[in-house]
UniProtKB/Swiss-Prot annotation:
InterPro entries: Protohaem_IX_farnesylTrfase, UbiA_prenyltransferase, UbiA_prenylTrfase_CS, UbiA_sf. It is found in: Cell membrane. One of its GO terms (biological process) is heme O biosynthetic process. This is Protoheme IX farnesyltransferase. Gene3D superfamilies: UbiA prenyltransferase. It is a multi-pass membrane protein. Its EC number is 2.5.1.141. Carbon 2 of the heme B porphyrin ring is defined according to the Fischer nomenclature. It comes from Buchnera aphidicola subsp. Baizongia pistaciae (strain Bp). The keyword Transmembrane helix applies. One of its GO terms (molecular function) is protoheme IX farnesyltransferase activity.
């Protein structure tokens, strides 16, 4: 039982849900570029590099957030909060993972992906985690940029080129993350307020946040349509994505009448997961 608990604690520090979400996005971007030709070796190298680099960022984020994690109710039981003496070890493990991931990327994938991974890591750790998360409401927007790079890495691992399609993917995934993240902020509003973290709902309130969520869902909807035409993805993708985005938008508008903001945010969050999961699956297998 002791060893099971140790493994669970280690997995918690790596934030496996975030890694899995990033892997799925990488596969979506890969699928858009590969157009039905799945190269298993390249996909494996992409996945391994992402696991190491994103895992490294997640571990360091745990270290950086120790001071606020001990204040928020939902994070008080995290490993590095309870056992602060492991922080130095966590930093060493994170730096080793980063080094190994970047070496794999530059040696076996390409320099474009290496630069994208490094840019995402630096943005997430220094600009987002160290500075903006605790000082500014725009932290979510900056975090969305680093969070939207995995699908670009998947795309560029095939094309070895950052083009207009990869730029649209970047915009599309960044736009998706805003309503997704704002919904999380509403759901955990009390924790963020107690910890004095200036997330958008805390600074501007629920009403303005709701309108921003709706606006970003509409912009995301447009970016998905643009992707269909600039990359010539088949119309099966367009039809399915149209109904998915329309449903997400419908719930965001319908739920405006609900006075319970957390119930509204819960539905927005749930649909954000459904939409991005299914879109990535279609992007990966849409050409097969």
């Amino acid at each position: 039982m002791y060893y099971v608990n140790v493994i669970l604690y280690l997995l918690e520090v790596l934030k496996p849900k975030i890694i899995l979400g990033n892997l799925l996005s990488l596969y979506g971007g890969y699928g858009v570029a590969a157009r039905g030709h799945i190269y298993s070796k390249l996909l494996f190298l992409d996945s391994l590099s992402l696991f190491l680099i994103v895992g490294s960022a997640c571990v360091l984020n745990n270290v950086i957030d120790c001071d606020i994690d001990k204040i928020m109710l939902r994070t008080q039981c995290r490993l590095l909060v309870k056992y602060n003496k492991f922080c130095k070890l966590a930093i060493l493990i994170a730096m080793f993972m980063l080094f190994l991931g970047l070496i794999l990327c530059v040696k076996f994938i390409n320099v474009v992906c290496f630069c994208l991974f490094l840019l995402g890591w630096l943005t997430y750790i220094f600009l987002y985690s160290f500075f903006l998360k605790k000082t500014s409401a725009i932290s979510t927007i900056v975090g969305s940029i680093s969070g939207s790079l995995p699908p670009i890495v998947g795309y560029c691992s095939v094309t070895n080129n950052f083009d207009f399609c990869s730029l649209n993917l970047l915009i599309m995934f960044a736009l998706w993350q805003i309503p997704h993240s704002y919904a999380i902020c509403i759901l955990h509003f009390r924790d963020y307020k107690i910890a004095n973290i200036p997330v958008f709902p805390v600074i501007y309130g629920f009403k303005i946040t709701r309108y921003h969520i709706i606006l970003h869902i509409i912009l995301f909807f447009i970016s998905v349509i643009v992707l269909t035409f600039i990359n010539s993805i088949n119309y099966k993708f367009l039809i399915i994505s149209f109904f998915l985005c329309l449903t997400w938008l419908y719930y965001s508008l319908l739920e405006l009448t609900i006075k319970n903001s957390k119930l509204w945010a819960k539905n927005i969050f749930r649909w954000s997961i459904i939409v991005i999961f299914l879109l990535n699956i279609i992007m990966l297998f849409g050409f097969v």
